[in-house]
Amino acid sequence: MLKSKTADFDSKQKLSIALNHAYGMKVSYGLTGYGRQVALDIRFQYIRPERVKDPDYIHEVVHMMDQILHHALFDQKSFEEAKYLLASRLRRQNDDPDSLALKMAFALAAEDHDIAIPIQGALEDIEALSYEEVVALYESWRALPRFVSCCGTLEPVMEAFLNAIPQFEKPSLRMALIPRTSPSFQVLEKNIAQTSIVQVWATSTPIDSSRYYPLLVLNSILGQGPMSLLFEEVREKTSLSYSISSSLVRFDGALLISTGTSADSIARCLRLIQAQIQKCADGQFSDEQLEIAKMDLIDMFRRQQDRPWAMIEQLFLDSMLERSESLAQRVETIRTIERDQVCEVASRLALVSMAIVKEDFDETMEN
C-alpha cells in the first residue's frame, strides 16, 4: 500500500508519472528478518543533481521522498487490492515445490522460534486482516525512529531533509539461535515434475561469534561456492540431483541445504549429503578448496565496494552488531582461517528438520 499513492499523487498513475518526471527516480520497498525483528526498508535512487540541468530537480526529489515517507494515502480500495495481490503471491508460492519445502522445513525446525514465522505472512492471517489494523500499524510505524544511511554525495537541501527524520543511534538486535533438537520430518506428495528437499541444520554459531567467519568458509566449501562438495559429489559425479546448494540464515543460526532430485534418488541423496558434512567435520577437503572458499568470500566483500546497496546493508549489519571492522581487517580475518576452525563449526551442525515435497507420479498423465 505504501507504493500506491500519496497526498499529492493520489493515484498510481500520478505517482508513476511524477517519478518518471524526476528523471526516472526509483523507489523500492522490502521486508527483511533480523532475528526477532523485521526491518521495513524504503530505498530511493536518483541521478546526481550536477548531471541534470534543472535547478529545481533536487527539490523535486526531496518532495517525492517526503510524500512517500510521510504522506502515504490509504483507502479501502487500495487495501483490498494489496490484500488480493499478497494472497495471490502466497498461493503461487505454495504451488512452487521449492518454496513450499522451505516453508515446511522452517515450520518444523522450531515451532516457537521466529524462523517458523513466514516474513510475508500466512494466507489465513491475511484473509482475517482488517483495513483498520493496517492503518493503525502505519501510524505506529510513522512514529518510530529510523536508521538513515546513504551512499553518494549529499546536497545541503537533501542533508537537511534527512537530518530532520527522527533517527536512532543504532538498530537494536534481538536474536535467538534455533535449538538443537531431535529432527522433525514431513513428506508431502504433489503432482509435480521433481522432488524438492530442504534440510535445516542448527549451527550453534551466532553472527557475532568468532566462529562466524569460519562458518562462512564452511558454507562455501559445503554448498555455496563454485567447487562445493555438494555440487561435485551429489550433482556432477552421481547425477542424483538437478540442483543442490547450501545457504545460511545468519541471525537464526541455521544452515539450509536445498536439493532438487527425483523420488527414487531421495535416499541416496540424503546419504551423500550427510557424507559431505562429515567430510567437512573430518577435514577431508583439499587445501585448494579451502583457499578458493576464502578467496570467494574476500571477493564478495570487495565487490560490495562497487555496489551502493550492498555497502548500505553492510553498514546496517555492522551498526546492529556494534562492529567497526574495516575491509582490510575483514579480509585479514578470512585469510587467516585455518582448517581446524572449519572442522569445528562443521562438527557443530545438527539436523533439526527436513521437508520433502515429492512428485506423486500419476501414470494416467503419461497415457
Set out the residue ranges of the language-model regions.
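Active/ligand-binding-proximal structured segments within catalytic/core domains
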Residues: 1-22, 65, 209-222, 230-234
